[in-house]
Amino acid sequence: MKEGIHPKNHKVIFQDVNSGYRFLSTSTKTSNETAEWEDGNTYPVIKVEVSSDTHPFYTGRQKFNEKGGRVEQFKKRYNMGK
């Protein structure tokens, strides 16, 4: 690999703006806003709109499409289904 062309990877705090949930991870993204983590160190804070704390797939509050597929909709529309 070439030297000096790869972005630096460092620890950052991701914060969900909807719930306030925070988690520590690594990223190439950085921020001017910083916060202290549970380990006593200060890390940049990246604000996200959706995280595993608020995403419907992870919370179990997802909606399923109850309309059926295209064939079922066609049959229903033209009274072809029995």
Curated annotation (Swiss-Prot):
Keyword Metal-binding assigned: no
Keywords: Ribonucleoprotein, Ribosomal protein
Cellular component per GO, a single term: ribosome
An MF annotation (GO) of this entry: structural constituent of ribosome
A single GO BP: translation
Induction pattern: Only found in ribosomes after the end of exponential growth. In PubMed:12904577 its expression was predicted to be repressed by the zinc-specific metallo-regulatory protein zur; in PubMed:15049826 it was shown that its expression is indeed repressed by zur.
InterPro entries reported in the protein's UniProt record: Ribosomal_bL28/bL31-like_sf, Ribosomal_bL31, Ribosomal_bL31_B, Ribosomal_bL31_sf
Top-rank taxon, per record: Bacteria
Summary of subunit composition and partner proteins: Part of the 50S ribosomal subunit after the end of exponential growth.
NCBIfam families: L31, PRK01678.1
Record function comment: While neither of the L31 paralogs is essential, this protein does not seem to function as the main L31 protein. Has a higher affinity for 70S ribosomes than the zinc-containing L31 paralog; is able to displace it to varying extents, even under zinc-replete conditions.
Family from the record: Belongs to the bacterial ribosomal protein bL31 family. Type B subfamily.
The name this protein goes by in its record: Large ribosomal subunit protein bL31B
Source organism of this protein record: Bacillus subtilis (strain 168)
Biological classification of the source: Bacteria, Bacillati, Bacillota, Bacilli, Bacillales
Gene: rpmE2
